[in-house]
């Protein structure tokens, strides 16, 4: 059996080497047991810097991408955060150690239920899970200080921009369904004004919804 504690330390060291310097993100990832979010058969690779498959044809992002996206949201502590694409729940559990409250939307009920159970087992009482169309956001809990989207959209869903607080940041991959996307950081400057920053090329599963890609199933 792999020494997960040692592997976790090495993972954080690698994140620092690759340019992640947000101490809150590093501390959270250095304490959370990532192996608890990995499907059986892939646990040995829990701390490798690679995406891994989970159920419903989805993936858990590589540790670097998780760290980079959360760090790009510039969370200082106590924020109201929306996550689109709960997946295994790992990213939400990291965010929960930094932010005040996190609301996470997952399209697949099986993934949402499994993530909810993990959160309960870990005692994460500031994570709220909903099954539904992530491209619509979570309007009842808006506005948000940050929105992090773990799936690629054809364009920026308007409801997500509308649910940002002034000064809030939206981190979202935008581009093709099957190829690469650009990771964008959208900052709300005022009611109608938004700044856009390109953070680089990425590859995510598609965001499916009425404000995103159509469901092909």
Swiss-Prot record:
CDD domains: AdoMet_MTases (cd02440). Keywords: Cytoplasm, Methyltransferase, S-adenosyl-L-methionine, Transferase. One of its GO terms (cellular component) is cytoplasm. Transmembrane segments: none annotated. It is an enzyme of class 2 (transferase). It catalyses: [protein]-L-isoaspartate + S-adenosyl-L-methionine = [protein]-L-isoaspartate alpha-methyl ester + S-adenosyl-L-homocysteine. Its EC number is 2.1.1.77. Disulfide bonds: none annotated. It is found in: Cytoplasm. The active site is at residue 61. GO terms for biological process: methylation; protein modification process; protein repair. One of its GO terms (molecular function) is protein-L-isoaspartate (D-aspartate) O-methyltransferase activity. Coiled coil: none annotated. Pfam families: PCMT. HAMAP family: PIMT. Catalyzes the methyl esterification of L-isoaspartyl residues in peptides and proteins that result from spontaneous decomposition of normal L-aspartyl and L-asparaginyl residues. It plays a role in the repair and/or degradation of damaged proteins. Belongs to the methyltransferase superfamily. L-isoaspartyl/D-aspartyl protein methyltransferase family. This is Protein-L-isoaspartate O-methyltransferase.
């Amino acid at each position: 059996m792999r020494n997960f504690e040692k592997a976790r330390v090495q993972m954080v060291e690698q994140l620092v080497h690759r340019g992640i310097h947000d101490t809150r993100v590093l501390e959270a990832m250095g304490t959370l047991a990532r192996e608890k979010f990995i499907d059986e058969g892939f646990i040995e690779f829990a701390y490798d810097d690679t995406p891994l498959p989970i159920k419903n044809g989805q993936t858990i992002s590589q540790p670097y991408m998780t760290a980079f996206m959360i760090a790009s949201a510039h969370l200082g502590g106590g924020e109201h955060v929306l996550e689109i694409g709960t997946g295994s729940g790992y990213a939400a559990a990291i965010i929960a150690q930094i932010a005040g409250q996190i609301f996470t939307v997952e399209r697949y009920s099986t993934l949402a239920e499994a993530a909810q159970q993990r959160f309960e087992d870990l005692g994460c009482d500031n994570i709220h899970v909903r099954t539904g169309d992530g491209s619509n956001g979570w309007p009842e809990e808006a506005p948000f200080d940050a929105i992090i989207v773990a799936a690629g959209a054809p364009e920026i869903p308007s409801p997500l921009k509308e649910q940002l607080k002034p000064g809030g940041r939206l981190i979202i991959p935008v581009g093709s369904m099957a190829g690469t996307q650009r990771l964008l950081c959208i900052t709300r400057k005022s009611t109608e004004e938004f700044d856009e920053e390109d953070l680089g090329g990425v590859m995510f599963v598609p965001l499916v919804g009425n404000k995103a890609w159509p469901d092909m199933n």
